[in-house]
Amino acid sequence: MESGNSFLVFCGTDTMYLAKEICDYLNCPLGNMNVTHFADGEFAVSYEESIRGADVFLVQSTFPPSDNLMELLLMIDAAKRASAKSVNAVIPYFGWARQDRKDKPRVSIGAKLVADMLSTAGVDRVITMDLHADQIQGFFNVPVDHLYASMVFMPYIQSLKLDELVMAAPDVGGSKRASAYAKYLNVPLVLCQKTRTRANVVDEIRIIGDVQDKNVVIVDDIVDTAGTICKAGDVMKEAGAKSVRAIASHCVMSGDAPVRVDNSSLEEIVFTNSIPYRNNIPCKKLKQLSIAQMFAETIRRVIKNESISSQYVIK
């Protein structure tokens, strides 16, 4: 697909690996943009080619959150001031998505604040994947194309050819996601009920459903410390599961998460490449699948004003 000057693709500092893949599928060059860093930690962005009258697509996941979000905001602002026809933020991983509501008094709703900041900067459209909560789409006053990692996970699961397959949710909050996989594959669903006394620390997990002699695939969206998903895997293995593996959209994997995964009962943990693996500790059980083709096809459909709904395997 030749771009001419009708559309241009640029990327932030930490998402170049994915943007290059997307451009390969679109058969277009990656745009030339410069990020200048100053001694005090401040930075500025500038486009090194004309973007006047072009549909501009900015590929940038917001992880690590603060710098990458600020870089994206500056990219959007610069594109608007350079007379781009439209500015489309392609955000495979949307940071702050776990702050989607007031779950206790006197807290902010970070996801809504970030949505407001992007809108104020001048974004015309957001393309993202597997938001932590679907309702975040409603925080924006511009169109949001919400993609699903099932496009890459479903073929992978089917390629494993597992008998006695069971899909599992690591907590009640993830039951809708896991249920969609179970329904599509026509297999049973298992739920985990967890108690957590403080953030990132899981005290106890109880299994709701039968995993005896089953091959279990746990479905999640974000794996941060990996405490929940590893404990769920261990509990299921103790309950007689034949094998336990996990799929998750976003590979945050903070702190000792790699050690926790490698020491757990999980056979493997499979992510998309919405964000790069940044932990200095290697993880032998980790695998990443590319979402570049899915995002490239979505960009193509946006440019051509074609329907995007066929991009959804399951929701």
Write out the residue ranges for each language-model feature.
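PRPP-associated nucleotide enzymes
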Residues: M1-K315
